[in-house]
Design a protein with these regions (language model features):
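Thiamine diphosphate
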Residues: 1-113, 117, 120-212
Length: 212
């Protein structure tokens, strides 16, 4: 059994990845990803480059984001934007069970460290997931709904919110385009910019902090 030590779990994961394994480590609350910053920022994200490309760290860190019922402040944060600013780490934000499986499969095959943030509010959702193998490429956004009047860029569980908003807007004669980036590192800038060029308006719906 792994110790209840986030730093220990991450350290063992980095070491295992360096020796050729493809570990998936689980940090139960994304809030406690602050306890693995040394291992993820100064080790996992940099070893490939500091070794002149001789070493890879194919590590997947699975954790979560967002608030949930009966959770204190230190269990209700969304730190994905902070992690996305660390060079060398990839960040995925699945918006459904289907996306979660496909992105996880892709992450495991990636030779770089990947952090997957799952929204706590979606853990009770039930949805069909294909049993057969499938992958969802990183850096390819999913246009959930096409529109011409406004672009709604939504991440994680906020994709469901955006889709409901688009339905309400349609009743008012406003056609909203809903886009799920799937990954914010790498980010599919082309799909997002092409949509905004078409609609001339954009709203970002994300559980991260609005300002610094």
């Amino acid at each position: 059994d792994s110790p209840i030590s986030e730093a220990g779990i991450a350290g063992m994961g980095v070491g295992a990845a360096m020796t050729g394994m493809r570990p998936v480590i689980d940090i139960m609350f994304g809030d406690f990803s602050t306890l693995v910053m040394e291992q993820m920022v100064n080790q996992a994200a940099k070893i490939h480059y500091m070794s002149g490309g001789k070493l890879n760290v194919p590590l997947v860190l699975r954790t979560n984001l967002g608030a949930t019922r009966r959770s204190a402040a230190q269990h209700s944060q969304s730190l994905h934007a902070l992690v996305a600013h660390i060079p060398g780490l990839k960040v995925a934000l699945p918006s459904s069970a289907y996306e979660a499986k496909g992105l996880m499969k892709t992450a495991i095959r990636d030779n770089n460290p990947v952090v997957i943030f799952e929204d706590k509010l979606m853990y009770n959702d039930k949805a069909p997931v294909p049993e057969e193998e499938y992958l969802i490429p990183f850096g390819e956004a999913n246009v959930k709904r096409e529109g011409t009047d406004i672009t709604l860029i939504a991440t994680s569980s906020m994709v469901q919110v955006a889709e409901k908003a688009a339905e309400l807007l349609a009743q008012e004669g406003i056609e909203a385009e809903v886009i799920d980036p799937r990954t914010i590192v790498p980010l599919d800038e082309k799909t997002l910019l092409d949509s905004v060029k078409k609609t001339s308006r954009a709203i970002v719906i994300d559980e991260g902090h609005q300002s610094y």
